[in-house]
Amino acid sequence: MRRELLLEKIDQLKEIMPWFVLEYYQSKLAVPYSFTTLYEYLKEYRRFFEWLQDSDLVAVERIADIPLDVLEHLTKKDMEAFILYLRERPLLNANTTQNGVSQTTINRTLSALSSLFKYLTEEVENEQGEPYFYRNVMKKVSTKKKKETLAARAENIKQKLFLGDETMEFLDYVDKEYQVNLSKRALSSFQKNKERDLAILALLLASGVRLSEAVNLDLRDVNLNMMIIEVTRKGGKRDSVNVAGFAKPYLEAYMGIRQQRYKAEKTDTAFFLSEYRGLPNRIDASSIEKMVAKYSADFKIRVTPHKLRHTLATRLYDATKSQVLVSHQLGHANTQVTDLYTHIVNDEQKNALDQL
């Protein structure tokens, strides 16, 4: 979704929200949470508040008029009823008779609500320096996580990674072969954005940065001589990230056409640009997601930008066998998250079984 459209949809949701949600929004914007995350959270709050109205747990016609004390006095049974509603309600916009949403969707909804309740009961301060209320019903609500061993998860992910020579083969494919079967119209669009798209793919594969970190890169954040970029990690922390050398020619090629191709002025600080209505704009996350999906599906298998992050992490662990190094590269505070990559590249167990 383009940034302008995303902000427009956020404004539409903000117009119907209670005052305390608007305060929450401003607080999380300062963290900073991404606009995409806040948009998804606002949608979850709308769904929850509409359920409160339909269930007669609040006697107001407008969501904006929902009082704060309604949230304070919600019971565990109320929240369990909401979860059951999510499990059993008919799916919308789907050609299926199946009811209910997935457990992943339910967990996402509960995560959004937990964030709001934590803000109201722990983080915000009233005039007396106290939170708005203390009773956090979300702490009594348990979520059901998908049961899967690291080995099983690793095996599933491994099929969607471009390991070994496939990293460069993927970039070469986009560079030289992807355009062969395109229509004239598609070819024109591809050629206009080819250098930019290759630079984005190469950066993701060579640094392992998150999608949001790539989107928010500014010109001043990129040092092509040192092959280091400055990014804003989760929680707003700034971090220096090394970039593998194979990305340099792609990044330099993009820089060579950036100003003229996208009509960039000195005020256009975003590193990766798109053109919208003849004007340069910072490329949005949705455009990168669609671009990665398009090229990867044509090459081998449809993947997400996050799988390119997994690809870098797996290749780096395979080369160094250092979880600490991989953790630092990805911006993780500890090595627990990187346990997955040891399973992806660990063939010792399979080799031992082959000897039986």
Curated annotation (Swiss-Prot):
It is found in: Cytoplasm. FtsK is required for recombination. Residues 16-121 form the Core-binding (CB) domain. This is Tyrosine recombinase XerS. GO terms for biological process: cell division; chromosome segregation; DNA recombination. One of its GO terms (molecular function) is tyrosine-based site-specific recombinase activity. Site-specific tyrosine recombinase, which acts by catalyzing the cutting and rejoining of the recombining DNA molecules. Essential to convert dimers of the bacterial chromosome into monomers to permit their segregation at cell division. The active site is at 210, 234, 306, 309, 332, 341 (o-(3'-phospho-dna)-tyrosine intermediate). It comes from Streptococcus suis (strain 05ZYH33). InterPro entries: CB (IPR044068), DNA_brk_join_enz (IPR011010), Integrase-like_cat_sf (IPR013762), Integrase_catalytic (IPR002104), Integrase_recombinase_N (IPR010998), Integrase_SAM-like_N (IPR004107), Recomb_XerS (IPR023670), Tyrosine_recombinase_XerCD (IPR050090). Signal peptide: none annotated. HAMAP family: Recomb_XerS. Belongs to the 'phage' integrase family. XerS subfamily. Keywords: Cell cycle, Cell division, Chromosome partition, Cytoplasm, DNA integration, DNA recombination, DNA-binding. GO terms for cellular component: cytoplasm. The gene is xerS. Coiled coil: none annotated. Residues 169-354 form the Tyr recombinase domain. SUPFAM superfamilies: DNA breaking-rejoining enzymes. CDD domains: DNA_BRE_C (cd00397). It holds the Pfam family Phage_int_SAM_1.
